[in-house]
Amino acid sequence: NAAVAKKGSLAYDTSKAAANHLVRELAIELAPLVRVNGLAPATVVEGSSMFPRDRVISSLTKYEIPFNESEDTEALRDKLAQFYAGRTLTKAPITLADQAEAAYLLTSSKLSKTAGQIISVDGGLHEAFLR
């Protein structure tokens, strides 16, 4: 969302672009004492409080994903997670653990020379690739 514009997402996409730029600016301002990097997470459905039942149903309807309102909330969330996963190169849902792993890596000594970068944890969301 920070690099690829789309209709109906002006404020959201602008905020993402601003956050990415802030990471780069802070990396410059705080170096060499502090390394600043950012994570660009994809949609995490499982375990997210952002997806109560009504929002899940709204998203399933928006994306024309077949469902039955009698299905339990977790089954509906799984359908939505699989839809998002299907748009990625890895075809697997992104989890909170995936995000945590990337955050841990960024704070570890393994990436001690990395600064001013945005790490995407999105399963290879090719729609977000820079053109």
Task: Give residue ranges: language-model regions.
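A glycine/serine/threonine-rich, flexible loop-to-helix segment
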Residues: 44-87, 130-131
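Catalytic loop of short-chain dehydrogenase/reductase
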Residues: 1-18, 23-31, 41-51
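Generic structural signal for alpha-helix termini and adjacent loop/cap motifs
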Residues: 108-112
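Short-chain dehydrogenase/reductase
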Residues: 23-24, 100-103, 107
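Conserved loop-to-helix N-cap of the C-terminal "lid" that shapes the substrate pocket in Rossmann-like
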Residues: 38, 73-81, 92-100
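Short C-terminal tail/terminal secondary-structure segment
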Residues: 103-104, 114-131
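Conserved SDR Rossmann-fold cofactor-binding beta-strand/turn motif
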Residues: 36-45, 107, 120-122
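Active-site loop of short-chain dehydrogenase/reductase
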Residues: 7, 32-36, 117
